[in-house]
Amino acid sequence: MTPPPRPAIVIAATPTPNGDLHVGHMAGPYLAGDVYSRYLRGTGRPVVYTTCTDDSQTYVVATAHRQGITPEELVSRSTAKIERSLAAMGTVMTGLPPIDDRYRRTVLDYVTELHAAGRFKLRTVRLPYARNAGVFLFDGLVSGTCPVCMAGSCGGACETCGHPNNFDELLDPKYTVDPTDVVVYREQTILVLPMEDYRERLTAYYASRTPRWRPHAKQLIGELLARPLPEIPVTFPSTWGIAAPFPETAGQILYPWIEAMPASIYATWW
């Protein structure tokens, strides 16, 4: 007897619950994932098409501040809007899984195992800091100029060229919540994932896949591999997010993008 085909897993980009989906969101990852899922199902392949909201993003904090509400309230409102928009578009996505204790346990189990295996390294880094507000700036809390393409960019990665900018690399940083606040730099010891340790494996992985990719994505990977690979933050001195479980970074949170892989795992079985 022939076994049933293995289900395909299609995971759309995780939407940030700092507002409803706009046309660019809908026409981009969610419609594309829906079309691909329908195609696979049309060929007889079972499909799990899913995603989940990335509640820990700093964009939630910045937007909530502008609207005069709490981040928790913004997440609740926005998640409901996102679910309605996905349903109104007629996607075959089964729904958004709840970001609850099961989700947090999945994330913590994932990072704890990597930590125990010695994958993370302690680094003392220089971080932008809003002096009057008393907060460290990263991702959606900081804006400035991309050091690679010189376009306007938030922290973490440039949406124009795709290159990362970590720690103190963003030029002319401003606090997005209050651009008049004075930005200084302070050192903090955090955990990072040193991607350079995995260069050989990453190079082999992308060499086998980028020939099928679109030109812009293929070029970006080539540019990234031609440079020293970044050290991805694992923890960060902040308050909004999942508390880091590691004794050497007490009082810090897990960097939101470290949740991405366990979030994808969680979204497939909830």
Regions found by a protein language model. Name each.
Residues 2-32, 37-43, 48-51, 105-106, ...:
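Structured secondary-structure scaffolds
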Residues 2-78, 95-117, 126, 133, ...:
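N-terminal catalytic cores of NTP/NDP-binding nucleotidyl/phosphoryl-transfer enzymes
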Residues 23, 60-62, 151, 159-160, ...:
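Short, solvent-exposed loop/turn and secondary-structure capping segments
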Residues 78-94:
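A glycine-rich helix N-cap at a beta->alpha junction
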Residues 87, 116-119, 163, 207:
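Generic secondary-structure signature for well-ordered alpha-helical cores
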